Amino acid sequence: MKKAVEFHSEERGEMIRADLYTPDEGEGPWPVVIMGGGWCYVKELIMPEYAKFFLDRGVAALIFDYRHFGESDGMPRQHVDGWKQIADYRSAVDAVSYLDEFKGVLDPQRIGVWGISFSGGHVLAVGALDWRVKCVISQIPVIEGWYNAMRAHGSVGYRELTALVQEERERRYLTGEHRRLPHSGDPKKEVVMWPHPETRPVFEHIKATTAPNHEHESTIASVENVLLYNMRPYLPMLLDTPTLMIVAEGDDLTMWEREIPAFNEIVTTKKKLFVQGGSTHMTMYSDLSHLEVAAVQAADWLEEWLVAPYR
């Protein structure tokens, strides 16, 4: 069953809107996995496909729009701030834990977090900082935003990106207005955030079929936020939280050469690294058979830590 819900963020005037999916069989209170998307995602973008596998294991899914995106509040629109998004995950944990609306429906003692791509990094921080989170699933995560941007753009492309950021910073200071740049595209034709031409067609197809609220652009100011983004300091803080990391073999979008060392820095022995061969970063969205492989790994993890111990 799907139900639209809302809850306030850490800024009480800004509401976060979400879809709550509960299993069709059995009865609550259900364990729940909180799901947020990556760069410029909305809650309808691919996450419900993953959630189907979790529902089959008796785990509810709370899929939310970050502030500044989709149906949630927040200005300017299409503004990506990793730390605000991490705070929105924690506000979702607050809602599950404290709101009467969820009592008897969701079990606040059995909360997991799932993230993909940019949010695959977010959940590592959430798991490290929030003792209420009982397990983490980090899929194809961004670990260090600066490194990813430099590696993806190369030195010449990175010069063009940072020149645009500097130009925009002056303009924004003088006018107060935010301009945008494309989420992805062909860097030979325009400056984009993520210079991977294969990304745009996948997201355009998803927008046309299931996620009409998706806009394939972000504020230029978002670039500065991602350059400051670094999850490595939080990895040693994952002392006892069960953590699954799913990596696409050879991933050159979120850089598997950073993901695997990051996994090794996670302290808990309750951890698992799954390197998915034969898949790319984007086929985990565009190819349902590749999506299923990752989703089953995640569902197994949720069952192991949120379901099986409570039978």
Where are these regions (language model features)?
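Catalytic nucleophile-loop/oxyanion-hole region of alpha/beta-hydrolase
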Residues: F7-E10, K43-I46, F69-G112, L288-V293
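N-terminal cap/lid segment of alpha/beta-hydrolase-fold proteins
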Residues: M1-G28
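Short beta-strand element of the alpha/beta-hydrolase
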Residues: P29-G38
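Catalytic active-site module of serine/aspartate enzymes centered on a nucleophile-bearing elbow/loop
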Residues: G277-S279, S286-R311
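Conserved alpha/beta-hydrolase "acid-adjacent" motif
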Residues: D252-R258
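Short beta-strand/loop motif that positions the catalytic acidic residue
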Residues: L238, M245-V247
